[in-house]
């Protein structure tokens, strides 16, 4: 089963079992909804702890969550600095608009030019500012940085496992 990070518990809040969560998901409303299942990965623990969201509210830049069966600060203190994740079963395709993809769908795809030249595999995605940048590992060469703009990324074909790109002058 694959897990995907949606947030980090940074501290407790009050004495009634609430935790402060910094969201790292684009969909906090659905990921942290009451009744949602989250998996807390603690440092030095091999298996995650399964948690069900009992309440959620936004406070400043945090989400304050409480979990079923964890009514006091003593119950949740152990989760400080835990990473909250969801399984691939919780990822919903209707969260995405046409032309949007989850990072894990893009990483590992082959980058191929419109002329059919294989450039390498996409190894990571950077988010430095206005546009994401897809990093292509090229054998025997330095990494190629592709901005996620329509002029460069022409088509994503998940079934074929490739991304069709048109290199602008200066990218190679």
Curated annotation (Swiss-Prot):
InterPro entries for the chain: PRC-brl_dom (IPR027275), PRC_barrel-like_sf (IPR011033), RimM (IPR011961), RimM_N (IPR002676), RimM_N_sf (IPR036976), Transl_B-barrel_sf (IPR009000)
A GO biological process held by the record: rRNA processing
Record SUPFAM superfamilies: PRC-barrel domain (SSF50346), Translation proteins (SSF50447)
Domain PRC barrel: 98-171
GO MF annotation list: ribosome binding
Pfam families in UniProt: PRC, RimM
Keywords: Chaperone, Cytoplasm, Ribosome biogenesis, rRNA processing
Domain of life: Bacteria
Assigned GO CC terms: cytoplasm; ribosome
Main location: cytoplasm
Gene3D superfamilies named in the record: PRC-barrel domain, RimM
Subcellular location: Cytoplasm
Function: An accessory protein needed during the final step in the assembly of 30S ribosomal subunit, possibly for assembly of the head region. Essential for efficient processing of 16S rRNA. May be needed both before and after RbfA during the maturation of 16S rRNA. It has affinity for free ribosomal 30S subunits but not for 70S ribosomes.
Subunit structure: Binds ribosomal protein uS19.
Family annotation (HAMAP family): Ribosome_mat_RimM
Family: Belongs to the RimM family.
Domain notes: The PRC barrel domain binds ribosomal protein uS19.
Protein name: Ribosome maturation factor RimM
Organism in which the protein naturally occurs: Levilactobacillus brevis (strain ATCC 367 / BCRC 12310 / CIP 105137 / JCM 1170 / LMG 11437 / NCIMB 947 / NCTC 947) (Lactobacillus brevis)
Gene (name only): rimM
């Amino acid at each position: 089963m694959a897990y995907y990070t949606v947030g980090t518990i940074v501290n407790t809040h009050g004495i009634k079992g609430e935790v402060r969560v910094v969201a790292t998901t684009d969909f906090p409303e659905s990921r942290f909804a009451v009744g949602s299942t989250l998996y807390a990965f603690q440092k030095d623990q091999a298996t995650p702890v399964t948690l069900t969201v009992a309440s959620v509210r936004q406070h400043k830049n945090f989400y304050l969550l409480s979990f079923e069966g964890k009514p006091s600060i003593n119950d949740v203190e152990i989760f400080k600095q835990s990473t909250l994740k969801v399984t691939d079963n919780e990822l919903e395709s209707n969260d995405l608009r046409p032309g949007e993809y989850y990072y894990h769908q893009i990483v590992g795809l082959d980058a191929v030019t419109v002329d059919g030249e294989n450039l390498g595999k996409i190894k990571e995605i950077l988010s430095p500012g206005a546009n994401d940048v897809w990093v292509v590992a090229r054998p025997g060469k330095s990494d190629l940085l592709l901005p996620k703009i329509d002029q460069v990324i022409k088509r994503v074909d998940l079934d074929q496992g490739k991304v069709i790109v048109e290199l602008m002058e200066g990218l190679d």
